[in-house]
Amino acid sequence: MSQSSLSFQIEPVSKAQDQVIQQKIDLKTKPPGALGMLESLALQIARIQGPQQLQIVKPTMLVFAGDHGIAAEGVSIAPSEVTHQMVQNFAEGGAAINVFCRQLGLTLEVIDCGILTPVEGVEGIIDQRLGAGTGAIHLEPAMSLDCVDKGFAMARELIERHHQAGCNLVAFGEMGIGNTSSAAAIMAAIMQLEVADCVGRGTGINSETLARKLTLVELALLSHQSAMTGPKQVLACLGGFEIVQMTGAMLAAAERKMLVVVDGFIATAAALVAVTINANVRDYLIFAHRSEEQGHQRMLEHLQAKPLLSLGLRLGEGTGAALALPLIQAAANFYNQMASFSDAGIEAVV
């Protein structure tokens, strides 16, 4: 695998047209700032796409699935088999994310990044398997560095296919029993925080299970401390196959100047790694919502992110990212279609 396939050339967005963009927003038939966060969202999209017509084309939801060795220790209310069952549910159209994607006209793709046993006999699952579940991170590395590189390369090919098809917005969701443990460990390692500030109740575990989860994540961080010399090494030691591929896909999408809609705690952990690898990724990220997982707010603050929604969600699957899509479309539509004061013959209030 060539090194060129693993590096990402991501341009920072240009702020040269900010005055033009902001004036266009301010001269719409409304008081300045009256559309709140939709105005800052329109500015962000216009920085990426240019100050003329904004476009949301072929928006696509990517749900990355993988299993985690640590799940065998009972860190979730559900066993690892549920990952397989939910991936099958996605393929058959029965999950919350399927319902929301149908309602909103979002294309949905489900990627098997490495669940314990693949779903067979069902169409609609993309095979990008890196293994049959990761290593148990409190006992061994999750995967090798070569595996991280392979995951990034697969993710780049996935994004390239969508880019070539004309898609300019990708939303990120995930499924993997045990992945809040992995995400919390990644957060603690990169942000240099106490584990207790990062580990939460995930699927709704009780206090006894939470204490066990906390101990195992602390053990994982201690075990791999000397090996975690950079963000890719953090992924190799602590990550999930789905977190690795989300990270690579976010890097690839930013490289192609696509809008990247980030879902909840696990997707934000992938975004944290992506931004640590290349800070320019941050310009392309739209954070959909603040989840109930306790570490999520800290990660959002670290990334200087203001999420669009706060609905008390803790499901994952990309559900929050899907629900944010109409707001992103509304930001583009008001920018494109709303009359200016001069167009409407109204006295300006700027």
Curated annotation (Swiss-Prot):
User: Could you name the active-site residues?
Assistant: E317
Could you tell me the Gene Ontology terms of the biological process aspect for this record?
A: cobalamin biosynthetic process
- Which Gene3D superfamilies does this chain map to? 1.10.1610.10, 3.40.50.10210
Query: Looking at its record, which EC class is this enzyme?
Result: transferase
* An MF annotation (GO) of this entry: nicotinate-nucleotide-dimethylbenzimidazole phosphoribosyltransferase activity
Please give the pathway this protein is involved in. Nucleoside biosynthesis; alpha-ribazole biosynthesis; alpha-ribazole from 5,6-dimethylbenzimidazole: step 1/2
Q: Reaction catalysed by this chain?
A: 5,6-dimethylbenzimidazole + nicotinate beta-D-ribonucleotide = alpha-ribazole 5'-phosphate + nicotinate + H(+)
User: Which keywords belong to this entry?
Assistant: Cobalamin biosynthesis, Glycosyltransferase, Transferase
Q: What is its EC number?
A: 2.4.2.21
- InterPro entries reported for this sequence: Nict_dMeBzImd_PRibTrfase, Nict_dMeBzImd_PRibTrfase_bact, Nict_dMeBzImd_PRibTrfase_N, Nict_dMeBzImd_PRibTrfase_sf
Q: Does the keyword Secreted apply?
A: no
The entry sums up its family as follows: Belongs to the CobT family.
Its job: Catalyzes the synthesis of alpha-ribazole-5'-phosphate from nicotinate mononucleotide (NAMN) and 5,6-dimethylbenzimidazole (DMB).
By what name is this protein known? Answer: Nicotinate-nucleotide--dimethylbenzimidazole phosphoribosyltransferase
Q: From what organism does this protein derive? A: Shewanella oneidensis (strain ATCC 700550 / JCM 31522 / CIP 106686 / LMG 19005 / NCIMB 14063 / MR-1)
